[in-house]
Amino acid sequence: MTDKTLEYRIHTKNPEPLTVIIEPWAEEVVLSPGSSLSLNILYDKEDLMEVETNPNYYVVWLWGGCRVKLAMNGEDLTRPFLLTPSP
């Protein structure tokens, strides 16, 4: 099986920190003003990604079977459980 990769980037210019939540793992990352977060989504079957926003948070819902690698401003934040396929 060969994984496909989708890169999704979130940039914040808010004057306040922005909380980004990656579901279904409930992984929270707090972005300081001017920061960016890269999500490298690994998958073999494409499906729907959903996003919910408000001024204080940004929620990204990924689809079943995918995995994700995170990097904030180029620094790897990937924790091992994020590389386990989502339910």
Model regions and ranges:
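Charged, amphipathic alpha-helical segments
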Residues: 1-5, 45, 53-55
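Asparagine-centered strand-capping/turn motif at beta-strand->loop junctions
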Residues: 4-14, 62
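Hydrophobic residues positioned within well-ordered beta-strands of beta-sheet architectures
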Residues: 6-8, 20, 39
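A cross-taxa feature marking solvent-exposed loop/turn segments within ectodomains of secreted
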Residues: 15, 44-46
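Short, structured beta-strand/loop micro-motifs enriched in basic residues and often containing a Trp
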Residues: 15-23
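Intrinsically disordered, low-complexity Pro/Gly/Ser/Thr-rich segments with frequent PxxP/GP/PP motifs
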Residues: 23-44
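Glycine- and charge-enriched low-complexity intrinsically disordered segments
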Residues: 48-87
